[in-house]
């Protein structure tokens, strides 16, 4: 029994190592984003390269992904805020035959502001240097180069910081530290 437990632990560690190695060997920050052929919910074909010239937030998600549902309203809010500077592509890794469920998911989870696409797979996460976890987000500059990526759900402060950088906006100024009053010493 101990042998089986040790082997299971080693297999888990090996799987994690292989996943990390695969991410390291895939697209890295500064690399050109890989090609990605997509379809919108009406079936029209699109390519990621069609969006060169404008920064893109490429978010991979699925209808079965609970963290994806939780982050959808935040992504939609940020798309509305940055609509003139950044395009959000919400790319489902679900099979294309579940388009009605995809549309219902977007509506239910308040993702209406997002440009929704299909045609990606879990392998696409690897191609973009993401861990095999959902959701996964890639930040691509106007020249089509990857500038950042996040495996897992995004938190508001982290997303806002990355979007300011991607949109070329200055970040918040550090709060100046209050000066300590000079100590008076009586001699």
Task: Show where each model-derived region lies.
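Structural microenvironment flanking redox-active thiols in thiol-disulfide oxidoreductases
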Residues: 69-109, 120-125
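N-terminal "domain-start" segment that seeds a small globular fold
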Residues: 25-48, 113-114
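Non-globular targeting/processing and membrane-anchoring segments
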Residues: 171-187
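Short active-site neighborhood of thiol/selenol oxidoreductases, capturing the structured segment around
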Residues: 47-66
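Bacterial N-terminal signal peptides
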Residues: 15-24
């Amino acid at each position: 029994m101990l042998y089986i437990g040790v082997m299971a632990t080693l297999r888990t560690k090996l799987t994690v190592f292989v996943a990390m190695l695969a991410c390291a060997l895939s697209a890295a920050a500064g690399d050109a984003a890989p090609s990605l052929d997509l379809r919108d919910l009406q079936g029209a074909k699109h390519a990621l390269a069609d969006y060169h010239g404008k920064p893109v937030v490429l978010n991979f998600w699925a209808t079965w992904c609970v963290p994806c549902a939780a982050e959808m309203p935040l992504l939609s809010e940020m798309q509305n805020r940055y609509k003139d500077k950044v395009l959000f592509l919400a790319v489902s890794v679900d099979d294309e035959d579940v388009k009605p469920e995809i549309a219902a998911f977007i509506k239910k989870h308040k993702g209406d502001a997002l440009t929704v696409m299909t045609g990606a797979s879990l392998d696409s996460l690897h191609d973009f240097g993401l861990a095999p976890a959902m959701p996964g987000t890639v930040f691509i500059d106007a020249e089509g180069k990857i500038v950042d990526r996040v495996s897992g759900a995004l938190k508001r402060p982290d997303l806002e910081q990355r979007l300011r950088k991607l949109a070329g906006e200055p970040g918040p100024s550090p709060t100046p530290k209050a000066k300590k009053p000079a100590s008076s010493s009586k001699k």
